[in-house]
């Protein structure tokens, strides 16, 4: 059987008891290593599990799934995913591939950023569509996320923005030359995300958000050094939140006063926070 095992958000101890039992008895254990990262190394996982873990990069998962699934019709294979197993469509594809091969699969869920973002004190049922922010380049600055944020803003809902990570990526030159040389890992910061959002607004000019829009920056959610910072997009574009992973929440206009009381504690500047809040935030129903 193929087991997709969620690892949670932070370290080796976040795995569930059920998930750990699967890892200990599986014939092979793979760690998906490109849609997200844990805050600890693979070696620390191996020490905790008491067994080797095979790192599965994008190429192996998306084009070499037969290797992962080999023998899973006769023995257990564990595929470990940071957060919750179905946080990325790639993992759905793996289950569908297993189904085509007549291999049973089972999912063992865990906490993901989609639920973990509740650490901000923002009520989860006040969130709208989640969007992703990719690294802008000189020639590629996609703004499709803006339309989804606009829909959330019109409903007064919060928007969770997931930030880009680049792991085992090739430059265009190395790709063109067929050289298997990979760029150093890159992880988008809250400051980069806020800056790109303001750049998008400058281009689209639809007033969906602006320099005075309130947002929450979250870093290393679930970890011992978790950090929250609240401020305007302008303030967050200048904040240093330390090592990855980062996420950002654009505050919805219908934010409740209890949410205000909770997040105000993390404000870059409480006077600026109060001024921005009083310009149009707060539940109206």
From Swiss-Prot:
Residues annotated as binding S-adenosyl-L-methionine: 9, 84, 87, 112-113, 163, 221, 246
Keywords: Cytoplasm, Methyltransferase, S-adenosyl-L-methionine, Transferase
Gene Ontology CC: one annotated term: cytoplasm
Reaction catalyzed: 2-[(3S)-amino-3-carboxypropyl]-L-histidyl-[translation elongation factor 2] + 4 S-adenosyl-L-methionine = diphthine methyl ester-[translation elongation factor 2] + 4 S-adenosyl-L-homocysteine + 3 H(+)
Pathway linked to the protein: Protein modification; peptidyl-diphthamide biosynthesis
InterPro entries per the UniProt record, alphabetical: 4pyrrol_Mease, 4pyrrol_Methylase_sf, 4pyrrole_Mease_sub1, 4pyrrole_Mease_sub2, Dphthn_synthase
CDD domains linked: DHP5_DphB (cd11647)
Principal place of residence: cytoplasm
MF annotations from Gene Ontology: diphthine methyl ester synthase activity
Name of a matching Pfam family: TP_methylase
Keyword Transferase attributed: yes
Localization (cell): Cytoplasm
GO biological process terms on file: methylation; protein histidyl modification to diphthamide
EC number: 2.1.1.314
Similarity field: Belongs to the diphthine synthase family.
Role, per record: S-adenosyl-L-methionine-dependent methyltransferase that catalyzes four methylations of the modified target histidine residue in translation elongation factor 2 (EF-2), to form an intermediate called diphthine methyl ester. The four successive methylation reactions represent the second step of diphthamide biosynthesis.
Record protein name field: Diphthine methyl ester synthase
Organism this protein belongs to: Aspergillus fumigatus (strain ATCC MYA-4609 / CBS 101355 / FGSC A1100 / Af293)
Recorded name of the encoding gene: dph5
């Amino acid at each position: 059987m193929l087991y997709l095992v969620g690892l949670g958000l932070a370290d080796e101890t976040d795995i569930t008891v059920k998930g750990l039992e699967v890892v200990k008895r599986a014939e092979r254990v793979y760690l998906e290593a490109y849609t997200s990262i844990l805050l600890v190394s693979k070696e620390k996982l191996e020490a905790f599990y008491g067994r080797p873990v095979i790192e599965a990069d994008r190429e192996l998962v998306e084009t070499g799934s037969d290797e992962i699934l080999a023998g899973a019709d006769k023995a257990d294979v564990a595929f470990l995913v940071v957060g919750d197993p179905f946080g990325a469509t790639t993992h759905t594809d793996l289950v569908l591939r297993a189904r085509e091969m007549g291999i049973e699969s089972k999912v063992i869920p865990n906490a993901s950023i989609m639920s973990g973002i509740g650490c901000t004190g923002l009520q989860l049922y006040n969130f709208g569509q989640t969007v992703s922010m990719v690294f802008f380049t000189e020639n590629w600055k996609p703004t499709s996320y803006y339309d989804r944020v606009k829909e959330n803003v019109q409903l007064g809902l919060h928007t969770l923005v997931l930030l880009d990570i680049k792991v085992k990526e090739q430059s265009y030159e190395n790709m063109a030359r067929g050289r298997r040389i990979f760029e150093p890992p890159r992880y988008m910061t809250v400051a980069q995300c806020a800056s790109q959002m303001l750049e998008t607004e400058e281009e689209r000019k639809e007033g969906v958000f602006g320099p005075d829009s309130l947002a929450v920056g979250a870093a290393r959610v679930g970890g011992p050094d978790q950090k929250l910072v609240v401020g305007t997009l302008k303030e967050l574009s200048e904040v240093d939140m330390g090592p990855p992973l980062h996420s950002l929440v654009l505050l919805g206009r219908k934010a409740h006063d209890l949410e205000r009381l909770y997040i105000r504690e993390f404000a870059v500047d409480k006077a600026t926070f109060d001024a921005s809040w009083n310009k149009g935030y707060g539940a109206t129903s």
